[in-house]
Amino acid sequence: VGMDTVGPFTFNGVRFVIGSLALLPFLYFHREGKSPLPTSIPLWAAFLMVGIPLFLGATLQQVGLQYTTASKASFLTANYLLMVPITGLFLGQPLLRNHLIGAILAMAGVYFISITSDFSISLGDGLMLLCALSFTVQIHMLNYLTQRFSPVLLSAGQFMVTGVLNLMLAFLFETPDLAGLEGAAWPILYTGILSTSVAYTLQAVGQKYMPPTEASMILSMEMVFGGLSGLFFLDESFTLRQTIGVIAMTLGVFLSQIPSPVLLSGLRRRNQ
């Protein structure tokens, strides 16, 4: 809705800068409850480590929305739920049985949602899968960095990095103007404050106290709200093929959240 009057880079640039600025009062009053682990990583580098994956994920998502529906985008982006435990295996995190079964079900769902009758995948669907991979990296980075820096400070930094990078692209590839920003004011404010400043900061704070796989499971509920939003507010609809894909992917998502035996131990841990 917000991109009716502004381009995706302009939308995300202003949105994330607003999200960063909205955290300034909380940075002043915030007190760290858990002592951070020692680190040699400079603060600016930490901002880039978590901000660049967020920039890639948010930008790919925003651009991809121009080539696919909000409902399909929501379900495809949710693939980070399955990418997180699989990539986590290479970071020393165990792979559970239900994670593997859930991944197979969800990939079948992705096929039915994204692949057309001529076995092609649309540009928007491909961008959304790359978006999911970017968010996977961001989740793992947050898991590592929130043990070493304040989650609120990290959030403000990653938002500013994402916003500035988007604004740079906006001035290169778009023509931002005040009239367009005024037309998208409410969507930008909503996503900047609630979807960005509040939601992403709560994610960062939560990831300080839980492993990335559990965090991705909770975050996956976004796909439910995204799909319902597309159906009820944007007059979108699912074909029978897409409905089968949605059911398969939803089953895979929820199955992966059920505790089960370990299939593979983390590769780093096993090799040590």
Q: Which stretches of residues belong to each language-model region?
A:
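Hydrophobic/aromatic residues within transmembrane alpha-helices
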Residues: G2, F11, R15, G64, ...
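Juxtamembrane helix-entry segments on the extracytoplasmic side of multipass membrane proteins
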Residues: D4-G13, P38-L43, I115-V137, F171-Y190, ...
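Transmembrane alpha-helical segments that form core, pore/gating elements
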Residues: F9, G19-L23, M83-I86, F90, ...
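Helix-helix packing/entry segments at the starts of transmembrane helices
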Residues: V14, A73-N79, M141-G163, T196-F232
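C-terminal-most transmembrane helix of multi-pass membrane proteins
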Residues: F16, A184-W186, S220-Q272
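C-terminal transmembrane-helix exit sites in multi-pass transporters
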Residues: A22-L27, Y80-I101, V224-T243
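Hydrophobic transmembrane alpha-helices of multi-pass small-molecule transport proteins
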Residues: L23, L95-I115, F135, N166, ...
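Specific transmembrane alpha-helical segments of multi-pass solute transporters/efflux pumps
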Residues: L24-T77, F112, G192-M210
